[in-house]
């Protein structure tokens, strides 16, 4: 399979997965009657990260968390100690974080979100990475965290590429 077809196929699979999750959510869960504990937990994680507080992030994950934060090009981070090590490596590089969510839908034990990981590095780079994510809960804690994003955009932004008009449009929506 040639590269453009592989990329198109991968994006189609990710989009189909998102549609399947949205379609499977009952009106009670996806609508106004749902419990917001999962969304509130994610907002607390985001607030912790905005404050460069690794322990505040980790307070909302299980000890055996599985964190797939590279869209599959690196192995999953497994366990709270390993996640702490990764976050402690990332935190000193980031000057300011504007990570946010635009849309979310819940099922019984998971929440599917669309958002943007936007941040400014201490070296002055402005990075914008649109993403979709799935967070699986065990009780009130996240036990699995999967992120899906275009690694090409991530690499180009980290190498200094400017924010495109398309990215500006994608991230200009109000956050939840």
Labelled PLM ranges:
Residues 40, 55-59, 63-109:
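A solvent-exposed, acidic/Ser-Thr-rich amphipathic alpha-helical stretch
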Residues 15-16, 84-176:
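A beta-strand edge to alpha-helix "cap/lid" segment located at domain peripheries
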Residues 1-8, 16-23:
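N-terminal secretory signal peptides
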Residues 34-53, 60:
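Short, aromatic-enriched amphipathic alpha-helices that serve as compact interaction elements
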